[in-house]
């Protein structure tokens, strides 16, 4: 709920500061570069770079959260701040690190999105819905599940768009609802500790 409220404030601030015009990032020939897999299948290089970046970031986060002292403290504080404080976790420091990681990841995601498509201050709501659906499809609390959920959502929308572009977003929502109905914990639920 706080994220939706914050997104409305940010959206209106961007409209006031920069206008509501649609924009895109210039990436030169990278925008049209692709890798031919044969059989008439071409994958855009920007998409491959985005997937590779996502895998690297998620892998790095997984290692950070499971192997570093700060990462373990972050996980503990997300479960119970008072108990984490008893073990020496400084809640303000943990929240500051978590916020820095979140904003850094957000900036990287924004750059990757800007290289693939145009954007405007009002585009965030739809992207936020897709992100929410990817997290739920993959499983709350599972980093790799979120990646899988995003891939399933994106591939479903792309496959349906090939046949009927008007139904692509609806198809993604149907997959989301099907996962909620048949596997509400997600495809890769987080392990309970």
Regions picked out by a protein language model, each given a short descriptive name:
Residues 79, 90, 141-142, 165, ...:
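A helix-boundary/kink motif common to multi-pass secondary transporters
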Residues 9, 83-84, 136, 152, ...:
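Hydrophobic/aromatic residues within transmembrane alpha-helices
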Residues 16-19, 77, 107, 181:
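Conserved catalytic core of Hanks-type protein kinase domains
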Residues 40-119, 143-149:
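Helix-loop-helix "hairpin" substructures at the membrane interface of multi-pass membrane proteins
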Residues 100-106, 110-176, 181:
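Transmembrane alpha-helical segments in multi-pass inner-membrane proteins
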Residues 3, 78, 130:
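Conserved catalytic core of two-component sensor histidine kinases
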Residues 1-67, 94-97, 159, 171, ...:
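Transmembrane helix-bundle core of multi-pass membrane transporters
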């Amino acid at each position: 709920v706080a994220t939706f409220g914050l997104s409305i404030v940010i959206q209106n601030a961007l409209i006031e500061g920069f206008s509501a015009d649609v924009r895109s990032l210039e990436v030169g020939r990278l925008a049209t570069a692709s890798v031919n897999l044969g059989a008439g299948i071409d994958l855009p290089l920007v998409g491959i770079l985005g997937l590779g970046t996502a895998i690297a970031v998620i892998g790095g986060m997984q290692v950070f959260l499971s192997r570093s002292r700060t990462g373990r403290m972050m996980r503990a504080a997300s479960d119970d701040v008072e108990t984490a404080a008893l073990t020496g976790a400084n809640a303000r420091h943990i929240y500051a690190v978590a916020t820095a990681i979140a904003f850094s990841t957000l900036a990287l995601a924004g750059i990757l999105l800007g290289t693939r498509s145009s954007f405007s201050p009002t585009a965030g709501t739809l992207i936020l819905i897709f992100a929410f659906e990817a997290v739920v499809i993959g499983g709350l609390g599972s980093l790799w599940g979120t990646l899988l959920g995003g891939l399933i959502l994106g591939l479903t929308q792309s496959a349906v768009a090939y046949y009927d572009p008007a139904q692509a977003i609806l198809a993604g929502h149907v997959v989301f609802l099907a996962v909620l109905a048949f596997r509400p914990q997600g495809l890769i639920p987080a392990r309970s500790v």
